[in-house]
Design a protein with these regions (language model features):
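Active-site bordering "gate/hinge" segments
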Residues: 1-234, 241, 331-347
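Homeobox/homeodomain signature
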Residues: 14, 194, 265-267, 293, ...
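Structured core elements
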Residues: 203-205, 237-239, 247, 302-304
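Dual-mode signal for accessory low-complexity, basic/Gly-rich regions
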Residues: 231-232, 247-314
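Short loop/turn microsegments at loop-to-beta-strand junctions
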Residues: 233-235, 325-326
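Internal helix-turn-beta structural module
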Residues: 288-340, 344-347
Length: 347
């Protein structure tokens, strides 16, 4: 919990989030959704909002849920109405325990929020008092995200390779959808490509973390959490043919976790549901963000398995697991746009 003191760095960082990323206007109403771990950050956000001429309030949902219990709770209509009627909303609670789909009673609202259409932001506030925030870097990353999104719309072939053996090809002309994801703020951004069925072939060597499985919010398959770090183990190989996961190998314990996921979930999450091209470059994303599983790092792509049979409508199906691939070389129609995790001038 942050001690509520007048730390100028935290106020400067909060102002950038509210004013620049939130694009607030005087007279608007702002809501922060917080719990015990994030309430101090929410207080700072509201103080900044008032200085900018907004009306602001905090909804503390700690007594409503807390920890894993959030996932099993029904929709609370007062919270739902507050979100629907606010001009902008910042969710400061952990995004792997809460999301706007849960609060609003419609799972599709999770993806709507991630795209920024509703001005409902997933705000990773942890460490805000210590961030060495570089506003221009963040804005440049967001601009690159839009440029890459535009390039993909007219692209034909996407190839991802790594020194550790990843060699994956996607026929982009058959993609069901693609989205610029820029509402997980302040540091994160990506372009999410939803590949068409039958369009992905090759091998992914997942040497990074895996996201907590959506249907099993417990142990990640490849955890990278404080006190539970398994990235030193053999990377996991994921083998795709025509967008179907046909096999996997790696550390025996981690492979057994994936075996169990396939057994427990119906329909089994054997589809290549997403290729996430991470455009964020701020080191703060890796230090302060995604702490629940250590995934979604910079200088990565992630490849998701899942059971999305509504392709073109949603990014995240009932089951969805991202696997990070470090230091990728990304080639688009023969042009290298990212080399060993670093974007080139081509994008």
């Amino acid at each position: 919990v942050v001690l509520y003191t007048r730390n100028e760095r935290i106020f400067t960082n909060a102002r950038f989030v509210v004013e620049t990323l939130g694009e607030c206007k005087p007279g608007e109403c702002m809501v922060c959704i917080a719990d015990a771990a994030t309430y101090g950050y929410a207080r700072v956000m509201c103080d900044v909002a008032r200085e900018l001429g907004l009306s602001a309030m905090i909804i503390d949902i700690d007594c409503y849920g807390g920890d894993e219990r959030y996932m099993k709770l029904p929709v609370m209509e007062p919270l739902r109405q507050a979100i629907l009627h606010a001009d902008l909303v910042f969710m400061l609670t952990d995004q792997m325990l809460t999301d706007f789909g849960m609060f609003l009673g419609n799972p599709d609202e999770c993806d709507t929020a991630l795209l920024g259409h509703s001005r409902c932001f997933t705000f990773e506030a942890t460490g805000m008092e210590a961030w060495q925030l570089d506003p221009q870097r963040i804005l440049d990353d967001r601009a690159r995200t839009l440029r890459l999104y535009k390039k993909l719309q007219s692209a034909r072939t996407l190839t991802i390779t790594t020194a550790r053996g990843t060699d994956l090809t996607c026929d982009v002309t058959r993609a069901d959808a693609m989205y610029p994801v820029m509402a997980i703020i302040p540091f994160y951004a990506e372009v999410a490509l939803i590949p068409g069925l039958g369009s992905v072939n090759g091998t992914v060597i997942a040497d990074g973390a895996s996201e907590c499985a959506y249907g099993q919010r417990g142990e990640p398959i490849r955890p990278a959490q404080a006190g539970n770090m398994e990235l030193w183990k053999k990377p996991m190989g994921l083998h795709f043919r025509d967008s179907l996961l046909i096999g996997w190998d790696g550390d025996a314990v981690q492979a057994a976790r994936l075996d169990k996921l396939m057994e427990d979930v119906d329909p089994a999450p054997r589809l290549c549901d997403e290729i996430g091209l991470v455009t964020a470059t701020s080191v703060e994303n890796d230090r302060w963000g995604w702490r629940i599983d250590g995934s979604h790092q910079t200088r990565c792509v992630h490849v998701a398995i899942g059971n999305n049979y509504r392709r073109g409508e949603v990014i995240h199906a009932p089951e969805h697991v991202d696997f990070d691939v470090h230091e990728p070389t990304i080639t688009l129609d023969g042009t290298v746009i990212c080399e060993n995790g670093v974007f080139t001038d081509a994008v």
